[in-house]
Every structure is written in C-alpha cells, then in structure tokens.
C-alpha cells in the first residue's frame, strides 16, 4: 500500500479521534486563572514537538516521501496530541481551564489541522472553521502552513523519559488493580533524575509525592534508562510475579548485550566504523550492564524476602 496510514485517518475511528478531541477542547470552560506549572511545561513540550515534526515533514515533502510524511503527522496527532498533551493540560473534572493553556491548545489544534489538510481536506476544513470564529472568506485551503518555530531537542528527549515513567507507574496500577483515586508515592532509587517535570509526572500518575529514597521490600521497581524507580505497595506486592517479570527483562538484556559485545568484538567493525558509532555501541554495553546489575540485585532481594516470609 502506498499510503498505509491514509486508511487509518479516513476510517470512522480515525475521524472520530479528531472529532472527539475537538469536542473535548470546545467543551472546556475557560477562566482567567494562573496557568498550572504542569500545563506550562506541557505547552513548551508540545511546541517543541510540533517544531520537530514540521521540520521532518518539510524534509519528507521535499523528497516526495508522502507515506513517511503522513506517518509523522498521524503519530503527532494521535499519539502526542490526543494521548499525551490534552491529558496533561486537561482541567480536573468540573473545573475550568486557564485561558493561557486554552489559547495554546487552540493554536496547536489549528496547526495540526493545517498539517493534516493535504491528507484529509474535508474534515480538517470543518474542524479548522469550528475552532474559532472566522470570516466567511477564510478557508484552510488558502492559509499558510505553519513554520518550524522554536525547536528544543533536549526537551523533546526529556519528555520521552517522562512518558516512560508515567507508562511504568500506570502499568503498576493496572497490574494490581489500584484505582486512580488512590495516590501513590514514586521513589527515585538511584541514577539521574530531573525534578523539573515533577508536576507533570505527579498529575499524570496521580501521585502523592516524588521522593529520593531507597526502595523497601514491598516496592515494585522499574528502570527508565539507567535510573531506577520504585512504587511502595505495602503487602500487595506479588513476589513471584515481580521475579518472573524481572527475569524476563534480564533474559532480554542478556541477549541484547551479547549482540552488542559481538559487534564490539569484531575488529573490522571497530577499525572501520565511525568513532561516534563505536562510542554509541559502548554506551549500549555500559547501559545494559548497569541495568542487568540492578535487576539481578533486585531479584535476589525479592527471593530473600520470599524465603524469610516462608
């Protein structure tokens, strides 16, 4: 198929995703309130994310890579805007949204309709017209496409870590049937952590607090990069399940490390590859070894705890 993602956007589900996002945003009550810190961070992140996507789109269009361009804008709307950004700025149930975040959200939505327009001309015209009041002579067809704007590669990269942390905490809730109304504590056990994103993580994970602390035996732990995190669970932890999950990750990392070591053990590769490529492989080796060390220690601790209980 030439345009594999076209059917996704033309399907009822694809159209519904856009209409549902519009209904959500237009259904908010707007008030003159201070912008929450988490929403301010979300706006800066999505601005940087849109800039990176537009740069990628421009490159794809210049090289006639239409399928790739469609994939970029599809993922930007579905994964980043609908699944992450809107949830980060969404006000609490029954509460208004601050005017600053709302204006930014309308601006982003308008940019997205412009980027989608070449692939979905009719629905994007309707949505674009519905976002704000416009003169009858205005049309998305004669509106200039958005420029790249302010790029911030570091912020975009940092947010991948944020999303991985949020996804891990949500998985812990799901696996143990812990309702969202029950606040959790997130512990930073070891490694680097930037507390600039605390408010976003706290909101998205429904946390009571984020602290630097050693994990106890009742904690469910996970790794993002080489940083270890833990969520204390009291007596609800399933030791056998945790050990099994960690062992599966150990097995995967051992295989991954073996493939990296094989590559680094190839003298021709080390001699002829670019220095930055070799350095990247060595970083993969170091990261995998660090993760394996942490996981093996955690498995032993959990097995020891289980033996003590018995």
Protein language model features and the residues they cover:
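Short, small-residue-biased leader/transition segments that mark boundaries at the very start
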Residues: 1-8
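Feature 926 captures the class I aminoacyl-tRNA synthetase adenylation module centered on the KMSKS loop
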Residues: 9-310
């Amino acid at each position: 198929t030439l345009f594999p993602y076209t059917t996704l956007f033309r399907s009822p589900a694809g159209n519904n995703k856009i209409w549902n996002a519009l209904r959500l945003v237009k259904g908010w009550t707007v008030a003159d309130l201070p912008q929450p810190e988490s929403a301010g961070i979300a706006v800066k992140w999505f601005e940087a994310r849109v800039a990176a996507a537009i740069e990628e789109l421009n490159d794809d269009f210049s090289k006639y890579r239409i399928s790739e361009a469609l994939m970029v804008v599809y993922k930007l709307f579905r994964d980043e805007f609908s699944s992450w950004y809107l949830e980060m700025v969404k006000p609490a149930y029954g509460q208004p949204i601050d005017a600053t975040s709302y204006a930014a959200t309308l601006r982003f939505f308008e940019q997205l309709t412009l980027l989608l327009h070449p692939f979905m001309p009719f629905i994007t015209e309707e949505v674009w017209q519905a976002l704000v009041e416009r003169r009858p002579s205005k049309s998305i067809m004669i509106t200039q496409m958005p420029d790249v704007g302010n790029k911030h590669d570091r912020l975009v990269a940092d947010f991948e870590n944020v999303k991985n942390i949020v996804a891990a905490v949500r998985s812990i809730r799901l696996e143990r049937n812990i309702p969202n109304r029950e606040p959790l504590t997130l512990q930073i056990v070891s490694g680097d952590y930037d507390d600039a994103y605390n408010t976003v993580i706290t909101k998205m994970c429904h946390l009571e607090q984020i602290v630097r602390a050693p994990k106890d035996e009742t904690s469910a732990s996970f790794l993002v990069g080489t940083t270890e995190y833990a969520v204390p669970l009291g007596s609800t932890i399933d030791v056998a399940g945790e050990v099994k999950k960690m062992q599966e990750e150990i097995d995967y990392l051992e295989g991954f490390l073996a493939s990296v070591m094989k590559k680094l053990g190839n003298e021709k590769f080390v001699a002829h590859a670019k220095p930055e490529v070799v350095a990247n492989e060595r970083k993969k080796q170091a990261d995998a070894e660090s993760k394996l060390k942490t996981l093996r220690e955690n498995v032993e601790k959990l097995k020891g705890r289980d033996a003590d209980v018995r």
